[in-house]
């Protein structure tokens, strides 16, 4: 080997050796591609949840139904702490797992201003984890609190039936929806009583082990559904947290404001938006939904039901302003 080649080989060997020393002393994590969760949530210390369910529970808070339980049975925590904890675990699980799947169904990017669970963990893992957690909570309830198990399974069936009705309407548009306005409102209220009302009724049944609060909690559930529907199209704060305005319209959801807008003289814009999904038709439809007539009718409906369940509404603590109207 010539002197020149020997010198070149020596230089290359020295460079590779130096690089090896550097790599050995670098943290192994620095050599790995970044976890996609880290890009969204920040440093590794902030990446506490490795599970979609725990992630969404951190957003809402553990046992976030506790104020409702305290109102229904002020002494339950002291008199039967095991059942108290189990009720809260059941409510967390059913509510949050429904949210996880609902965000996938709606193709939502955000939940309460944070990335939706499926954006971080993927649709498959998020959906499967929701099914797993619900299965686990049903099994645990059956084994440890068998008297509560029928309430859980019956209410869950009602919730999913309501969700199924809503999804069929979304799939078929107006073809499977009643034609007359009054019938449409009735259909919406029935769907809401299943989809959301059953969740609130479940709480009362678990705490009291009877149906004595069904009527009241059904009204609380309807108010909650109605409030969410209205925030979706009338609240700038809610739109910011969700990352979009009128997500329900874009998903062809038949919500209360949209049903009212269909009955307006320019309601054909809603139908066009459902059919085409084009930005122009969506914008025209939003104009109809945010019209004074629809806005006032929604406020009247909210006030009517709030007057019956004001104490419960205060516990729910939803305060976004309905500030978007034409």
Curated annotation (Swiss-Prot):
Binding-site residues, Mg(2+) 1:
102, 106
User: Which UniProt keywords are present, listed alphabetically?
Assistant: Glycoprotein, Magnesium, Membrane, Metal-binding, Transferase, Transmembrane, Transmembrane helix
Q: Does the keyword Transmembrane apply?
A: yes
Question: Which Gene Ontology biological process is one annotated for this entry?
Answer: mycotoxin biosynthetic process
Q: What topology does it adopt in the membrane?
A: Single-pass membrane protein
Explain the purpose of this protein: Cytochrome P450 monooxygenase; part of the gene cluster that mediates the biosynthesis of the indole diterpenes nodulisporic acids (NA). Nodulisporic acid A (NAA) and its chemically modified derivatives are of particular significance because of their highly potent insecticidal activity against blood-feeding arthropods and lack of observable adverse effects on mammals, in particular the tremogenicity associated with the paspaline-derived IDTs is not observed.
The similarity annotation says: Belongs to the FPP/GGPP synthase family.
According to UniProt, the name of this protein is Prenyl transferase nodC
Which organism is this entry from? Hypoxylon pulicicidum
């Amino acid at each position: 080997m010539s002197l020149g080649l020997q010198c070149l080989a020596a230089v290359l060997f020295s460079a590779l050796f130096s690089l090896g020393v550097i790599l050995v002393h670098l943290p192994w994590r620095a050599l790995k591609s970044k976890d996609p969760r880290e890009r969204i949530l920040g440093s590794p210390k902030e990446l506490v949840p490795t599970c979609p369910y725990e992630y969404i529970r951190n957003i809402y808070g553990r046992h976030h139904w506790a104020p409702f339980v305290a109102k229904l049975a002020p002494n339950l925590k002291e008199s039967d702490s095991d059942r108290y904890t189990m009720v809260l675990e059941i409510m967390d699980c059913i509510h949050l797992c429904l949210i996880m799947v609902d965000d996938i169904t709606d193709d939502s990017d955000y939940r309460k201003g944070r990335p939706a669970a499926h954006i971080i963990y993927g649709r498959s893992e998020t959906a499967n984890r929701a099914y797993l957690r619900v299965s686990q909570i049903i099994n645990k309830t059956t084994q440890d609190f068998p008297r509560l198990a029928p309430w859980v399974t019956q209410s869950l069936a009602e919730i999913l039936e309501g969700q199924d009705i809503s999804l069929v309407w979304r799939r078929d548009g107006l073809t499977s929806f009643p034609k007359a306005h009054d019938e449409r409102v009735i259909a919406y209220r029935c769907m809401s009583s299943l989809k959301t009302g059953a969740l609130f009724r479940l709480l009362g049944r678990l705490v009291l082990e009877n149906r004595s609060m069904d009527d009241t909690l059904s009204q609380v559930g309807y108010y909650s559904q109605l409030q969410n529907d209205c925030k979706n199209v009338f609240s700038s704060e809610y739109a910011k947290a969700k990352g979009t305005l009128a997500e329900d319209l874009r998903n062809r959801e038949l919500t209360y404001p949209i049903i009212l807008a269909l009955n307006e003289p320019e309601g054909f814009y809603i139908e066009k938006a459902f059919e085409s999904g084009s930005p122009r038709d969506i914008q025209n439809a939003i104009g109809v939904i945010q019209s004074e007539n629809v806005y006032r009718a929604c406020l009247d409906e909210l006030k009517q039901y709030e007057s019956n369940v004001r104490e419960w509404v205060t516990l729910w603590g939803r305060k976004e302003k309905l500030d978007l109207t034409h």
